[in-house]
Amino acid sequence: MAERPEERQWKEWEEAGLFEADPDDRESVYITVAYPYPSGSMHVGHARTYLVPDIYARFKRMQGYNVLFPMAFHVTGTPVVGIAERIKEGDEDTIRLYRDLYGVPEEELEKFTEPEAIVEYFAREYEENMKRMGYSIDWRRKFTTVDPEYRSFITWQYLRLREKGLVDKGEHPVRYCPHCENPVGDHDLLEGEDATIEELTLVKFPVEGDDLILVAATFRPETLYGATNVWVKPDEEYLVVEVDGERWVVSEEAYRNLRHQKDGVEKVDTVRGEELIGESVVNPVTGEALPVLPAEFIDPKFGTGVVYSVPAHAPADAAALEDLKKDPSVLEEYGVDPSVVEELEPVQVIEVEGYGEFPAYDALEEHGIESQTDPELEKATQEVYRAELHKGVMVVDEFEGTPVREAREEIKSRLIESGDADVMYDFSEKPVICRCGTECVVRILKDQWFLRYSDGEWKERAEELLGRMEIVPEEVRANFEDTIEWLDDWACARRVGLGTPLPWDPDWIVEPLSDSTVYMAYYTIAHRLKGKGELPPEVFDYVFLGEGDPEEIAEKAGLDVEELEAMREEFEYWYPLNWRLSAKDLVTNHLTFFIFHHAALFPEDKWPKGIVVFGMGLLEGQKMSSSKGNVVLLSEALDEYGPDVVRLFLATSAEPWQDFDWRDEYVRGVQRHLERFETLIRDHADESVEDKDAVDRWFLHEFREVVEETTEALEGFQIRRAYNRAFYGVMKLLREYEAMKGHVKILGEIAEDWLKLLHPVIPFATDRLWREVLGEDSFLLEEEWPDPSEYPEEPELSVAKEVLDRLIEDVRDVEKVIGAEPGYTLHVYLAPEWQWRALELILKDKEFGEVMSELMKDEGLREKGDEVAKIVQELTKEDLPEDVDVDALREALTEFLEAAGRALTDKTGASEVVIHTDPEEAPGPEDRKAGARPLRPGIWLEE
């Protein structure tokens, strides 16, 4: 196969060592992104993930920083083991996926019965595609998570965590596949990767006169004091299950979970929801009898399918109760007297700032919710829930004044202790589907090793670390805060899969999300550890914490002491990490674990500084999924469009934290724009403008603004904003300039800096043009980022351009009204001097009376006082940028309109344009001349 153009350029960059970062006297910038799990081919969704840090890394290098952007491969866990097993068993779906979608040759596919072969094949493919994309990665630091050196690093990490009491053994809830009979992680799933495990309190409501117990699941046991009734779904078939000698009424879904979480759970009967309506149950905390009523908002797949109603604090309950009051015929259908519902009134349990006595009803009103089926209910529920959790205090007698958070735990403990409640674990969202196709459950594993994320002190340190971090976008911070708050103990090891054995219990393997929390520290020394094999924990104690005697440690590890000290110096240079980038679905696990583990293992001066969260990739409007075949492989996109087109599309289609949608039609549009850009540079980069008029200076001022805005946007990872401005924005400026001047010679004045601005996003094209067209010998990455101060700052010209654009619109409107034929003379009347004086006074925040008093000193103006007053009133509505000087604007406007006259004749029917700076002395109808204003000239079409 012939060498692709980008391959030659990449080799030149690689030979020049452009991306290899070593400590020096420059300020460092260290950026990492989640390393890939190479179990399949790279698609364009992955490409966006790695493009964002690459753009930022290139940008910061050009600003003069020493930038480290490394990469590795995550191969821990069971996914590739499962894939190898399925291929070995001849599973057609798996074989078809790898042969037909990923294009794996038969001779390679035959080797895929071994998980190592899968990892090696796709790691090679990933690296090749990353190079084709031009990612500026320091590949010297590459590793896999099963390398002996990395396993030594994980061993050190877990010994340290155990020393701190943060790893323990006991019962623990995990995502579990009943078919595979194994816990599952994110990489093991076809669907439901975002689902977390949540603990629910099961409140028991005994049915009066029966041995049945309606069991309601809740996150908010503290609200039980405000329960008015219990809801069931009329057409749902509930199960009667025996648990510890009690007969519970729950949904089929709850039964599936309970079987995996408790011993001896047996299904003994069924009962339809409609059979339960009208029964009375007992509130275990108040002893009151509560009616069982019908509700449609219940989703039996979540919780138990039974809900106790607290209309004062739960918007869905309030809406459902009001629905029944508005339409009592529903009750009559089930033989319930409507008066039962009429008598139900909300009971306040919690007081919270910003809400009245019944927050749920406030939320219904605020969101305009009128029924229990309104989709806004979920949002309203979350708002009330969060407000009451963080700011609410109890108002019920026994707990009056107690914060909700404290009361919740106390009430839950009492209910469980008295036998009136139990606990069940469930997923935050469903379905959760294993790669084998089975729906997963939450299972309690016994004798399981887990990380104690529930530890109060650890949570506090994690919260402190988060508080110091910059989060992009900022609104995601609340998700991190919530996750730290609810995150419970996490099963950190499994019996099977690839990875690092627990050092004190080697039958267990550290699972993927637990061995990928602080590897950013490992990158700093990864290239120095290659080939060193297993290392004692003391090496990492010294490198990362400065603990121990380097000579003794070096001797024990078989290292040179200079080598060990160089590792310590390198870590000290690069840490703390500046930016960690990853997808939004990892906020509730990996990214929060990353915060916890840094808080536990490293001193505060080494805590990471920032996180950027990505959105998801869509293909023609549908979520990308390799397992479902709904992807565009990156290799195919690169073959068809080339790297710069792919990069520019991914960069400008959405901000990093937004979902982007890959559509071939749009990508082809980007391709056409990029071809036009290259043509412009090749045709006009060597041109220049000698005597620059107002239009030339306008263009250069606007380019100054482009440089400033692009720089600002890139600093904040606003990649789309940056390159919509720097690429499409400048292309638009050139079109507007050409419309006014008839050429684009001005391009030669900005060509160098434009290529520099665009280099982070389209490095291949810009580097090629830099050398071939501009004749430079250097690489653009070695050049300095453009300095906006090298361009004129004349904001008045931007205003003048806006005046011109509006003037053209006004002329076209008049043409339509009077039916003007092409060939007329266009007279443009600029406002008289006194109006400019009035505008200046107004912009100095002078009151109307002060402005009039100043103007009335002019005898000529006094004679037409009413007219002047009317015009001054008009001018008070004008708004100008603060940095615009009125005198300069008046001068600039005259000069600009004269220089841009071509646009007026090209875009209107005028054959000639005459600009009058003094309308009183100019020819033409008086009413046309009198209509002139500073920012809106008067016009007359002389036919």
UniProtKB/Swiss-Prot annotation:
Keyword list, A-Z: Aminoacyl-tRNA synthetase, ATP-binding, Cytoplasm, Ligase, Nucleotide-binding, Protein biosynthesis
InterPro entries named among the record's database cross-references: aa-tRNA-synth_I_CS, aa-tRNA-synth_Ia, Leu-tRNA-lgase_arc, Leu-tRNA-synth_Ia_arc/euk, M/V/L/I-tRNA-synth_anticd-bd, Methionyl/Leucyl_tRNA_Synth, Rossmann-like_a/b/a_fold, tRNAsynth_Ia_anticodon-bd
GO cellular component, one term: cytoplasm
Chain intervals for the UniProt region annotation (Disordered): 910-943
Main enzyme class: ligase
Location of this chain's protein in the cell: Cytoplasm
Motif extent ('KMSKS' region): 623-627
GO MF entries: aminoacyl-tRNA deacylase activity; ATP binding; leucine-tRNA ligase activity
Protein name: Leucine--tRNA ligase
Protein species of origin: Methanopyrus kandleri (strain AV19 / DSM 6324 / JCM 9639 / NBRC 100938)
